[in-house]
Amino acid sequence: MTKASTSGRGQGNPSRGGELALIQQLEERFRRLTLLLYDTSVPARVLDEEVVPFLAEDVSFTDPWQRGAGRETYRRGAAGFHCMFSFDFDIHQLNVQLEEGHEKGRAIVDGVMNLKQFSWLYTYPLRTILVFDFTLVRTPGGDVRPLVHAHEEMWSFGDMIAAVPGVGWVYTKLFRKGFSYGFLAASAICRWIRQ
């Protein structure tokens, strides 16, 4: 598998300079897609123009709360999120990997989704990992572009709870410590019973 990271330096051993150029082009495309999808100030019209053309008919979206499939379902869901919520995204790392033969690949984006629903009070930072599985198709002009077949959004309920003012302190300082001690005690008892 050939890879590139946000540093722009290849991490694999590309056999041709064209591979690295393709990976860097894909990296920029997925950076743009992420920033469009995860900035709710972007109007639905722009999503239709700049995101939808990169979605396969069978595209699926999965996060810890929901799963949906189909380009039209994805398009309506993205537009709905942009209407109902307020957030943006800070990208910390972005990596594109191509499978052998360069017909498909995966982009992984690591960052923070800044939930701004109550921005006058608090911007909620939610560590998020995005995974885009894609195939590559040739355009009539000979260029290659990705078609996203699966978009998965991953974040931790623990991180979500820890970021809530007040509740986060109780969760982090009391519950997590208490659970850790309880788990270690249960482990010791289990080991003692099995000996």
Locations of the language-model features?
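Short, low-complexity, polar/charged sequence segments that are solvent-exposed and flexible
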Residues: 80-81, 127-131, 168-174
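A solvent-exposed, acidic/Ser-Thr-rich amphipathic alpha-helical stretch
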Residues: 48-109
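Calcium-regulated, polybasic anionic-phospholipid
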Residues: 45
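Short, cysteine-centered beta-strand-loop-beta hairpins and adjacent loop/turn segments enriched
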Residues: 83-88, 114-125, 157-166
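Glycine-rich loops and low-complexity Gly/Arg-rich segments
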Residues: 85-88, 117, 132-136, 174-178
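Amphipathic alpha-helical protein-protein interaction segments
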Residues: 12-19, 63-70, 118-121
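Terminal "cap-and-tail" regions of soluble proteins that handle hydrophobic small molecules
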Residues: 2-42, 135-195
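Exposed beta-sheet edge and beta->alpha loop/turn motif
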Residues: 106-145, 149-155
